[in-house]
Amino acid sequence: MTYKIIIAPTALKMLKGMSDRRVRDLIIKRIDDLTEEPEKQGKPLVAELSGYRSLRAAGQRYRIVYRVAHDKIMVYIIAVGIRKEGSSMDIYNLAKKLIRLRLFNPSE
């Protein structure tokens, strides 16, 4: 079954803001790979990000945070960026803020 990919406007902005084209292209390829069996890729997240998954891209530093909607056969990409543990700019902290501020709602 092929899933449709929906990239949230904020995630698209994060992706377009990457200055290294090679890294951006690698991330786009990983996003494209999510059309097939997205629930078998990445790892499930916990706590505030429960229900979302994280996939490594472009080496070990970058992450794609997404949610799989099996009923709609869609994958929602909510954030793309660098894992900076302990930083307010860490991709997981940014994803939590997006969800808390309701800047991304996969049910829309």
Region annotations inferred by a language model:
Residues 1-29, 104-108:
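Arg/Lys-rich, positively charged N-terminal/basic patches that mediate binding to nucleic acids
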Residues 4, 13, 59, 67-108:
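Enriched for short, Lys/Arg-rich terminal
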Residues 17, 34, 67:
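Conserved catalytic core of Hanks-type protein kinase domains
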Residues 18-24, 47-49, 57-62, 81-86:
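Short, charged helix-to-loop "capping" segments that act as catalytic/coupling loops
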Residues 23, 27-30, 41, 87-95:
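Amphipathic alpha-helical interface surfaces
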Residues 32-57:
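A short, surface-exposed loop/turn module that caps and links secondary-structure elements
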Residues 54, 63-67:
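Short, surface-exposed charged micro-motifs
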